[in-house]
Amino acid sequence: MKLITRALFLKALPASVLLTGFSSLLLSGAVSAQDSAPTFYADALPLFQKNCVACHQPDGPKVGGITAPMSLMDYDQAKLWAPMIKNALITGYMPPWGAHERHRGEFKDERYIEDNELATLVAWVDGGALEGKPADAADQSGQIAEAGGTVLPDSGWWIGDPDLVVQFDRPVYVKDDIMDWQPTVQMPVPEGAHTEPKWVSKAELAPGGPWVHHIVSSHMGVGVPGRGPFTYPEGWGVLMPEDPFITVNMHYHKDPGEGTAITDMTRAGFVFYEDGTVIDHVVETNLLPHSGWTIPPGDPNFEVTNTHEIEEDIYLLSMGPHMHYRGKAMRYEVEYPDGERETLLWVPDYDFNWQFLYEYQEPKFLPAGSVMHMSWWFDNSTQNRWNPDYTAAVEYGPETTDEMANARIYYAPTTKRGIVVGNDIPADILETARKEEQNRRERANLLDQSQDDFAWLTEDSD
């Protein structure tokens, strides 16, 4: 299915948005059109182009497996959705972005809408969602280009034309009775396509659909619905050793029951650095998970904390908080060696449906001896509409109905390596990259031996 249905979109909206939305629909119909009221072409469209059309465009592209339910470049669709647009905006549901306003300007691809822009769009809806004259609109393609390259390239990949594309040998079949499943699967590399180690500059995961809860790979990082591609800063990269397979850990989550089986053909694309490029910083990642706690039944604000010491000078590239349905808020802080404390990331309203990677505009220096303080808050009460079971005592676990308290970071030591792409690769880096892939492959073998049913390996998905 190309587009998410309107019903599915409405199901995902908070109840307050729906109630206010339909009330707004009744009220907006009673508002008389005035000559001074904003119009779609003159007022709303430019703001949609600036803030929304990265997803909400004709034949909207998938961003991490999610497709927007309508195009906001089309007047008829925008008018139909106008009440929902207003309330998604005023409640902060859209544009989707978790980082607090205090972080404005710190992270790439941030999604904040200005107060005056919000007021204009609300006035457009309240004024009857008037069309206006198409001649009042500026050149659409020009505005989209100025908005930061929000049009999907002809290649179908946000990273442009990949140097390498891998996918499953055949679709993965997730049966009716499965709700959560975490197979570790190998994606074969096309013969002759990857015969020597390569430095990755860009990587994009294309989940087969919203039932893909996450994808983990040594070379691609972590992919979840709604998260875009990895594009490393100039001089930063990840080494992909030559190998006939790319091993990925998949986590599928869906409602079980008759007729719910799905087939998945997740893909991944890579762009490599050209020979002669200098790699100064080899990207490393740390999940920083924390377990050993239990969320009491009905607790609306359960807090979990953990610390992590920085043992060498590093540049912090990005942060990716991760919880499940009971996740409420998350904070990263750093305590410097002199005792000064700074908030690195504050996500006051965590949304399981939008799991962003917050990448700094410029990598942030953290000196050796600094201590990271991580805090997670969970809502296990009836007030949490996503809560699978408020009567359960919840612990850290792999199922989506369990919980997690992860604080993934991407970083690199500050010491420059000066590795020239195309020349010999330092032995320590090559050994580490090969070991990571081998460890993941061994876990795949262990999974094969322990799973009772691997019908998807042979079952016809037609």
What feature does the model see in each segment?
Residues 1-11:
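N-terminal secretory signal peptides that target proteins for export/translocation
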Residues 11-28:
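Bacterial N-terminal signal peptides
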Residues 31-190, 195, 202, 208, ...:
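Aromatic- and Gly/Pro-enriched helix-to-coil junctions and flexible linker segments
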Residues 73-93, 386-392, 415, 420-421, ...:
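Extended, polar beta-sheet/loop recognition surfaces of beta-rich domains
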Residues 129-133, 276-279, 414-428:
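Short, charged low-complexity linker/loop segments at the C-terminal edge of domains
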Residues 145, 421, 430-433, 437-450, ...:
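Intrinsically disordered, low-complexity segments enriched in small/polar and acidic residues
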Residues 149-417:
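His-enriched metal-coordination microenvironments in redox/metal-binding proteins
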Residues 204-208, 318, 419-435:
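Acidic, Ser/Thr/Pro
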